[in-house]
Each structure stands twice: as C-alpha cells, then as structure tokens.
Regions:
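Active-site bordering "gate/hinge" segments
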Residues: 1-253
Length: 253
C-alpha cells in the first residue's frame, strides 16, 4: 500500500497492464496442465484511492493496488479450487500458481465424482474496457473540504478502477474494467444527531455534491428543533427512501 494519493490520469494504462498480466498468467497455467486436465481461472483487481474524513479534515489517505486469482482444476468428473493473492512480480506469482496447481492436483484423486459438474466448452471471448472519467483525487478532496467548511463532516472516499477477467485452458479470454467513485458521509448536529448522505457515480460534479450537501444543511436545521416526546400509541410514520432501503436490506439477509 502506498501512503499518498495518486491521480487517475493513468487509468487506461493500468487497465492494459492488468489485462496483459492476467493473460500472461493464464498462458502459464496452460503449460502446467497434464493429460486431460482443464483449468478455469477468474481474476479480480483494483487500483483505488481512499480517504477518511473527520471534522471536515482528511485524517487518512492512501492508494491501494491489489490482485487475486481463483483457479478451478478439473479432471473428468472431479474438480477442486483454490486462490492466490498476486504481488505483481511475474516470477513470484508464477511460482505461487505452480504451487497451487500442484496442491489442487494432489487433492483430485481423493475427491468423488461430481455428477453436477458443468462448465462451458464453447469458447466465447469478450472485452469491455471502461472509460475513466474519474476526477483527480487531491483536487476533488480539496473541493469536498471547501464545501464542507463549518460542518461536522465525517466520511469515506473511494475512487478508482475495478478489473475482472476470466480464462480457461480451452482458449477463452474475457476482460472487464470500470471506474467509479463513492463518497459516503454524515454531518453531525450533536453527539446523537446526524444527517447521512452519499454520492457515487462515474463522473464527479462539484455542483451535484454541493446540492447534496445543501440538503444536509437543511436537514440539520430540522434536527436542531426542540425534541418532542411522543406517548405510546398508533401513528402514521413517513420513512425517507434511504431509511426504508436500510430496513429492507436488514430483512433480506
């Protein structure tokens, strides 16, 4: 993990590097197979900026690049799976994959046949490369702090690229990338009273963020009113969409 924020101007280059790296590992996996073995591999990676706000100041900031690879090894009607975290160093990562394949191969003789084993044997390769319209992270954080001046602003910022790929020993290659941001925050009126909001998307707008923050200011005014004690009874209650969404999420666990 790096300790300072990195602008997103090189996102497309990272996309190409991630894809080439994954495809290289996929080709290497093919050389490790024996006989009728088949592999399925899924790749997941991110290249993201993060920041934590407290009292309208940036308290923590960082940049994260991480990669992982899941591998299914199939022989006849038997299959087993494992995963490795990738470092980005080709020699080290190929050694990890070699060890994983050996481990998976050692499991197969001890496993029963799986009558429900099913995977596509038809090769359908695709690519979908996202276009990064993400803002420069330091400039955006400065804009957020400026707009939140005077507020008890607490929140989390995340912005960057997400990458996923699929490959198999039959020759199929699939790749997908996207670039998003998410700012989740609360504005406190007092210790037990706060307004929560969020802003997420593909392209940042200062005007849209300011509009959402002004809504928070208006709602803070409501929280500042004299509280009323409501006696027990039956009442009709209005729930904001966000509140109703949280209740539905809880009930759908």
């Amino acid at each position: 993990m790096k300790t300072d924020l990195v602008p997103s101007s090189g996102a497309q280059g990272v996309d190409a590097e991630m894809q080439a790296y994954f495809y290289g590992l996929a080709d290497h996996l093919k050389t490790r197979l024996r006989g009728e073995e088949v592999y399925l591999a899924s790749f997941y990676a991110e290249d993201s900026d993060f920041a934590r706000f407290n009292r309208a100041l940036v308290r923590q900031a960082g940049h994260v690049t991480q990669r992982s690879l899941n591998v299914d090894l199939i022989l006849g009607e038997k299959s087993t799976a494992g995963a490795v975290t990738l470092s980005g160093d080709s020699t080290a990562d190929r050694a990890r994959l070699d060890a994983l394949v050996d481990e998976l191969r050692g499991r197969l003789p001890h496993l029963p046949d799986d009558p429900h084993l099913l995977y596509s044997r038809e090769v359908r390769s695709t690519e979908a490369h996202g276009s990064s319209k993400l803002p420069d992270a330091p400039a955006t954080l400065a804009s957020v702090l400026d707009a939140a001046r005077g507020l008890e602003f607490v929140g989390l910022w995340a912005s960057g690229g997400m990458y996923s790929g699929f490959a198999n020993s039959l020759g199929q290659r699939n790749w997908f990338s996207s670039y998003t941001f998410n700012l989740d925050w609360s504005v406190y009126h007092s210790a037990d009273k706060a307004v929560k909001s969020s802003y997420a998307g593909f392209e940042w707008s200062d005007a849209e963020f300011t509009r959402k923050l002004e809504q928070c200011r208006d709602q803070l005014g409501i929280l500042g009113r004299e509280p009323k004690t409501i006696p027990p009874g039956r009442y009709r209650v209005y729930l904001a969409p966000v509140a109703l969404g949280e209740i539905v999420d809880m009930l759908s666990w």
